[in-house]
């Protein structure tokens, strides 16, 4: 596995994230120390694109910016093996538009992981207009090999999960600005069967990622296409100005749910 980042320091930090996860497995008797060391030794941290030469799968995972993702695709797609495929870990951007930057759009597919990746089993696989069946099969097989649960969806802005959770977050923030207790808002979300509340979703996804996605949607002329994100944008603007506090601790409630 090649882990490539902007700097060597950032790449090493990414590799180091795996160490405590493996140590926990060893301490619980679920993995031998020797196997843990073998896994870490398989990860090559680098800041050089050339180390990607010959990869069977490259997964790009930068933030939600169409131009940036296009640039990365153009600069590094050529390092794939002859039968290699390109995966974009995008949560919102249409795969068919991202694939416009690829020389082989039939080998381009969305592979959307969820945070924290080591705990969340779901992987959303998004098929673009030109994605061929072999690429879909490889992406699906890869997800199963790493013990994830893949779901296959067609290409659309936000796909299935981001459209659902985006609306969920929007509604939670509407309640927040109306003065409801943040803890009660999240408890209401869990009461209807969601694993976490909408404000916790916002915190875990991060306001910065949501902000960048909102900006990209506005640039594409599709902001508020499936829900009213005006309140979300206002809250994010205020929160980032206010040093990035947690949504759950944003303010004192003025209203309560009976």
What function would you assign to each model-found segment?
Residues 1-251, 255:
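N-terminal glycine-rich phosphate-binding loop for ADP-containing cofactors
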């Amino acid at each position: 596995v090649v882990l490539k980042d902007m700097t060597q320091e950032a790449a090493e930090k990414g590799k180091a994230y795996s160490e405590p996860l493996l140590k926990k497995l060893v301490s619980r008797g679920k993995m031998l120390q020797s196997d843990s060391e073998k896994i870490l030794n398989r990860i090559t941290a680098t800041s050089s694109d050339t180390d990607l030469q010959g990869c069977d799968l490259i997964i790009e995972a930068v933030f939600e910016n169409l131009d940036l993702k296009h640039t990365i695709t153009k600069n590094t797609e050529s390092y794939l093996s002859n039968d290699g495929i390109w995966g974009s870990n995008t949560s919102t951007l249409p795969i068919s538009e991202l694939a416009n930057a690829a020389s082989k759009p039939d080998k381009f597919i969305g592979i959307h992981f969820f945070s924290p990746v080591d705990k969340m089993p779901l992987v959303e696989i998004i098929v673009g207009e030109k994605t061929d069946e072999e690429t879909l099969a490889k992406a699906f097989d890869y997800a199963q090999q790493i013990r994830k649960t893949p779901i296959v969806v067609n290409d659309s802005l936000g796909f299935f999960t981001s459209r659902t959770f985006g609306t969920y977050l929007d509604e939670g923030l509407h309640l927040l600005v109306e003065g409801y207790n943040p803890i009660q808002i999240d408890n209401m979300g869990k009461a209807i069967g969601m694993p976490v509340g909408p404000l916790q979703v916002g915190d875990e996804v991060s306001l910065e990622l949501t902000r960048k996605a909102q900006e990209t949607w506005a640039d594409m002329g599709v902001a508020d296409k499936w829900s009213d994100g005006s309140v979300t944008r206002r809250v994010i603007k205020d929160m980032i100005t206010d040093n990035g506090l947690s949504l759950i601790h944003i303010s004192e409630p003025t209203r309560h749910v009976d």
